[in-house]
Amino acid sequence: MGSFARVPLRLTVACGFVASLLVSASAYAGGMDPTPERLVLQPKVGGVVQGAGFCQAVAANPALAAKVGMLPDQLACTPDNVAFKNLVSELGFALAPSTMHSARTTGFGGFVLSLEASYTHINADGVSKGADGSLTQYWHAGTQGSVAPDGTYSAANNSPDSLIGVYTLKARKGLPFGFELDGAVGYVSNTSLWTIGADLRWAILEGFRTGPMGYFPDIAIGTGVRTITGSSKMYLTTVGIDVEASKPITLADEAVITPYIGYQQLFIYGNSAVLDATPGVNAMQQCGYTGQQASGAPACTNKVATGTAGQTVANDGDFNNNITFDPVRIQRNRGFLGVTYRYELLYLGAQFLFDLTSPNSIDPDLNSTRQWTMSLEGGVFF
């Protein structure tokens, strides 16, 4: 009974360790739910870009437009596509398939159930440069922020988290001919986001222990996909294609430790829904909406002065504050190295994943700072 009796104790310790990682997530405060509707460019007046909040102020008080000799619909918010691209790129890096496993599969009939905790560095104070030359702190503007005692959210996230935690329940099942299928569902800390996805890999070379081939490492290729749920504002899907090598080392007590190393090409796909850049203003109420004209324009009973004596126009400017971002298509090159430990039922792992190249070497709109992810895993191997 000796060695086997120690398994429950070790498994309890491992699960307790992973649980402590989950609890530690509460130390990060700030409300990291994406708010892409805040990532807007301000209009120009006399060729000069206006300050932050100007288009929102005009939407709330259309009479301000007449003071600068313009109409409200000429002073609408427009999407800051560069800021959105940076937000999607860094969030996609954090939520992408982690490739946290060795090249050797679980074997036909093998099964692993585990919990993975991953922490990804983001550029919390990162700045993007918009098409008009304006600078935006995309994590400050693009995430929810704190909640006031009256239940209202702040206009910006003044202290975005520098780490994004993702806690994933994974199941891996060995298949014939060296294939393995993974399923994953995860929660993104300090948000309402969840990730779901699956991985498939094929061990090209595995299991040789004797003879000349016994000196070669196990080699596998694989692919994985993750997508998010929990947000009606944006859609994010990541696809990874990887190759890795590993070599199991059997220890004296029959435990197996397996170091591994690999490369992943990551593809990030992001899109936005139609967003209201001025959620505090009811466009239909403001215009006195009565229906749609033959041209498709809203029919409004309320009017607003143009600045010219006696002239008014329909107060329909806020309808122009519905925005959609350009689709985001990004490629990232990532390296990873890690180690797994297996003893009877107990399965543990640790991995470090990192950018091999600067993001802006592939897309000049992106921030140059490289990202990394540290992952820990604990579970059972059947």
Q: Which residues does each PLM region occupy?
A:
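Transmembrane beta-strands of outer-membrane beta-barrel pores
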Residues: 117-121, 185-191, 202-204, 223-229, ...
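Detector for outer-membrane/organellar transmembrane beta-barrel domains
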Residues: 220-327, 338
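Extracellular loop and loop/strand-boundary signature of outer-membrane beta-barrel proteins
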Residues: 154-157, 184-186, 227-232, 320-325, ...
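Transmembrane beta-strands of outer-membrane beta-barrel proteins
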Residues: 111-115, 179-181, 198, 214-223, ...
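Outer-membrane beta-barrel translocator domains and adjoining extracellular loop/strand segments
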Residues: 126-130, 192-198, 230-236, 270-280, ...
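Predominantly the C-terminal beta-signal and adjacent terminal strand-loop region
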Residues: 30-40, 329, 333-335, 340-382
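Transmembrane beta-barrel domains of Gram-negative outer membranes and organellar outer membranes
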Residues: 29-209
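Residues that define the transmembrane beta-barrel architecture of outer-membrane proteins
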Residues: 107-109, 162-167, 192-196, 215, ...
